[in-house]
Curated annotation (Swiss-Prot):
The keyword Nucleus does not apply. This is V-type ATP synthase subunit D. Belongs to the V-ATPase D subunit family. GO terms for biological process: proton motive force-driven plasma membrane ATP synthesis. The lineage of its organism: Bacteria, Bacillati, Bacillota, Clostridia, Thermoanaerobacterales. It comes from Thermoanaerobacter pseudethanolicus (strain ATCC 33223 / 39E). Coiled coil: none annotated. It comes from the Bacteria. Keywords: ATP synthesis, Hydrogen ion transport, Ion transport, Transport. Produces ATP from ADP in the presence of a proton gradient across the membrane. GO terms for molecular function: ATP binding; proton-transporting ATP synthase activity, rotational mechanism; proton-transporting ATPase activity, rotational mechanism. The gene is atpD. The keyword Metal-binding does not apply.
Length: 209
């Protein structure tokens, strides 16, 4: 039985009882937070899984188109076609607070371009066009996937941190406080009985005298 080492006085008993009330309130708040974090985390994992499957399927399609394009075009033509991009893309990173967790929000900042394709059509194939078109439309999804995967990682870390705090309260601090309160209460009761017994003996001695 683990206890907190304090003097068994009524003042300490009152202080420990207040600490116990605070600890139990904190435990409930953290447990509620943990449950809500787990709920949001599972929702994110579900979204992440569905989006990953979608992105992977589209990437496979783009890769197939690109493979077919390479089989129909010379390596030099393929390299020259993709050498100079037709548009510049930058990413703006923001933060969103979810249950005290700052998760990233990625925003595409893309310069307007009249032409999606970074090449002329004279020496390229329809398959190359299809691959470029698919990859261009996939960019927002890939950024969203990156958002979700990072958010899942951060939420998992916060769940683990919260779980450790909940367990520390539930299995360490609260039992220590309860055991110490019981011990001090018992000691105070013993002292009170001893004092009462001494007083009774003194009273008897006075009456006999």
């Amino acid at each position: 039985m683990t206890m907190i080492h304090v003097n068994p006085t009524r003042m300490e008993l009152t202080s420990l009882k207040k600490r116990l009330v605070t600890a139990k309130r904190g435990h409930k708040l953290l447990k509620d937070k943990q449950d809500e974090l787990v709920k949001k985390f599972l929702d994110m994992v579900k979204q992440n899984r569905a989006l990953r499957e979608e992105v992977e399927a589209e990437l496979i399609g783009a890769f197939k188109s690109f493979t077919m394009a390479r089989s129909q075009m010379s390596a030099n033509v393929v390299e020259e076609s993709l050498m100079i991009p037709s548009a510049k893309v930058s990413i703006n990173v923001k933060k969103e607070n979810i249950m005290s967790v700052n998760v990233p929000k990625l925003e595409i900042l893309q310069e307007e371009s009249k032409n999606l394709y970074p090449y002329g059509f004279a020496n390229t194939s329809a398959e190359m066009d299809a691959a470029i078109r698919t990859l261009a439309t996939m960019l927002p999804k890939m950024l969203k996937l990156a958002e979700l995967e990072k958010a899942c990682q951060l939420m998992a870390d916060e769940i683990e941190k919260t779980r450790r705090r909940v367990n520390a309260l539930e299995y360490v601090l609260i039992p220590q406080l309860e055991n110490t309160i019981k011990y001090i209460t018992m000691k105070l009761d013993e002292n009170e009985r001893s004092s009462r017994t001494r007083l009774m003996k003194i009273k008897e001695m006075v009456m006999k005298g």
